[in-house]
């Protein structure tokens, strides 16, 4: 009996110790890995860069086989994508199954693929054909995953622009555009039925760019500020991104889908822009992305006021500066890294030894606004990898619209929201 009692006591002690040691948060940071460049490093060389910023998740805009193979047995979680041009084909479950067998199954289970996005910001494009095909394509891919026995492992979703909101201030008054509800509601029902995440691309940068005199810079950069209070809930917000996220949650609740979980599929800040792209500087990019990553990784602030029990899932845009992306200068300068593996700017914290040692930054150079005297030698020899046919879909679904209409539409909404936010600063 004494031995049994001893074992019981020891077991209770170990359980208690485990509860103390194990982290209580499941929050992690992800990064968007775009490939629109002719000077990008090989996927194998990319792995240490992703790990150096603490990212455990990667979002692709395609299903590039070279990348998926290179990341096998790394444990890094992947979202892969089907471009807008695939929507009409994916309506057919048999064609979707063929795509799954060619682009997903060969890499499992070594590569941790957990989600497939169907198109990007479709409802903001005002394209009736794409809008009509979106849900059937999502259903077709989900049906194919069921047939392949992968539906429990891999979810299906699509990413939306923040412009699908009619109102977003105060956050409690978040509401979807009425003219989108006929298309959006069945998609939300699909999410509820399949337990897949609702993805939003959110860029506070455009709010500041649109009206830098009215929008408090500290509020959008996660810097210390007085913040705002939602008069309906009493919740305090000290950054715009969290206010935007809760506005989306409020819109979902108003539409009858309170239980859906929101993930931020894109957010970021460019380090360079054209003359009219106010705020696109290395210092602001450092503060936005650096503060966001530090905040998420520290676990100190990983939930929004409206959803205190929901850990955030956020994907930073983007991993590299991509020299072949169309659009304004900023579109080619969202990267955390240059193609040679050096930092595009300091993030304000030390990276791991792989990058820190190669760049010569140490911990001392990590706090300079633009890298200071940091050694600019490449982390690894650049072996240009031009985008192949598997990557061309990214041109159609990247954060950079060729026409500029999509982000312009989102920027107008963000501007209205930000002006209201500025007027309510305490």
From Swiss-Prot:
Region (Disordered): 360-389
Record bears the keyword Cell membrane: yes
Keywords: Cell membrane, Cell wall, Cell wall biogenesis/degradation, Glycoprotein, Glycosidase, GPI-anchor, Hydrolase, Lipoprotein, Membrane, Plant defense, Secreted, Signal
GO cellular component labels: extracellular region; plasma membrane; side of membrane
InterPro entries attached to this UniProt entry: Glyco_hydro_17, Glyco_hydro_17_plant, Glycoside_hydrolase_SF
Residues making up the signal peptide according to the UniProt record: 1-30
Domain of life (superkingdom): Eukaryota
Catalytic activity: Hydrolysis of (1->3)-beta-D-glucosidic linkages in (1->3)-beta-D-glucans
Class of the enzyme per the UniProt entry, highest EC level: hydrolase
A GO MF label: glucan endo-1,3-beta-D-glucosidase activity
Pfam families: Glyco_hydro_17
E.C. number: 3.2.1.39
Lipidation (GPI-anchor amidated serine): 398
Subcellular location: Secreted, Cell wall; Cell membrane
Active site, per annotation: 121, 266
Positions of glycan attachment: 112, 126, 367
Disulfide bonds: none
Single GO biological process annotation from the record: defense response
Comp. bias regions, Gly residues: 360-372
UniProt propeptide residues: 399-426
Membrane topology, as annotated: Lipid-anchor; GPI-anchor
Keyword presence, RNA-binding: no
Family the UniProt entry places it in: Belongs to the glycosyl hydrolase 17 family.
Protein name: Glucan endo-1,3-beta-glucosidase 11
Species annotation: Arabidopsis thaliana
Lineage start: Eukaryota, Viridiplantae, Streptophyta, Embryophyta, Tracheophyta
């Amino acid at each position: 009996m004494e031995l049994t009692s001893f074992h019981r006591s020891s077991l209770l002690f170990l359980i208690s110790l485990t509860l103390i040691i194990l982290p209580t948060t499941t929050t992690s940071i992800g990064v968007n890995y775009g490939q629109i460049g002719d000077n990008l490093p090989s996927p194998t060389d990319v792995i240490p860069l992703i790990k150096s910023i603490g990212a455990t998740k990667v979002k692709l805009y395609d299903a590039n086989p070279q990348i998926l193979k290179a990341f096998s047995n790394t444990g890094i979680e992947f979202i892969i994508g089907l471009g807008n041009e695939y929507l009409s084909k994916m309506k057919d479950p048999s064609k979707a199954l063929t795509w799954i067998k060619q682009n997903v199954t060969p890499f499992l289970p070594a590569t941790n693929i957990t989600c497939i996005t169907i198109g990007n910001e479709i409802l903001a494009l005002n394209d009736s054909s794409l809008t009509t095909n979106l849900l059937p394509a999502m259903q077709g891919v989900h049906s194919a995953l069921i047939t392949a026995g992968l539906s429990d492992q891999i979810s299906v979703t699509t990413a939306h622009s923040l412009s699908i909101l009619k109102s977003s201030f105060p956050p409690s008054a978040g509401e979807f555009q009425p003219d989108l509800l006929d298309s959006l509601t069945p998609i939300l029902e699909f999410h509820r039925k399949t337990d897949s995440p609702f993805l939003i691309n959110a860029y506070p940068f455009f709010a500041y760019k649109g009206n830098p005199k009215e929008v408090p810079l500290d509020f959008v950069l996660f810097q210390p500020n007085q913040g705002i209070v939602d008069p309906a809930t009493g919740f305090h917000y000290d950054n715009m991104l969290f206010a935007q996220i809760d506005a989306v949650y409020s819109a979902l609740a108003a539409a009858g889908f309170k239980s859906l979980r929101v993930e931020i599929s894109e957010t970021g800040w460019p380090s360079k822009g054209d003359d009219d792209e106010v705020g696109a500087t290395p210092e602001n990019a450092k503060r936005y992305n650096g503060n966001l990553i530090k905040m998420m990784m520290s676990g100190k602030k990983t939930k929004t006021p409206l959803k205190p029990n929901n850990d955030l899932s956020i994907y930073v845009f983007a991993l590299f500066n991509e020299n072949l992306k169309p659009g304004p200068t900023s579109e080619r300068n969202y990267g955390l890294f240059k193609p040679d593996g050096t930092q595009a700017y300091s993030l304000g914290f030390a990276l791991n030894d792989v990058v820190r040692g190669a760049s010569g930054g140490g911990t001392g150079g990590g706090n300079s606004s633009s890298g200071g005297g940091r050694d600019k030698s490449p982390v690894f020899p650049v072996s240009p990898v031009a985008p192949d046919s598997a990557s061309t879909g990214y041109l159609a679904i990247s954060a950079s619209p060729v026409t500029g209409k999509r982000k312009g539409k989102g920027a107008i909404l963000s501007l209205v929201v930000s002006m209201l936010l500025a007027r309510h600063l305490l």
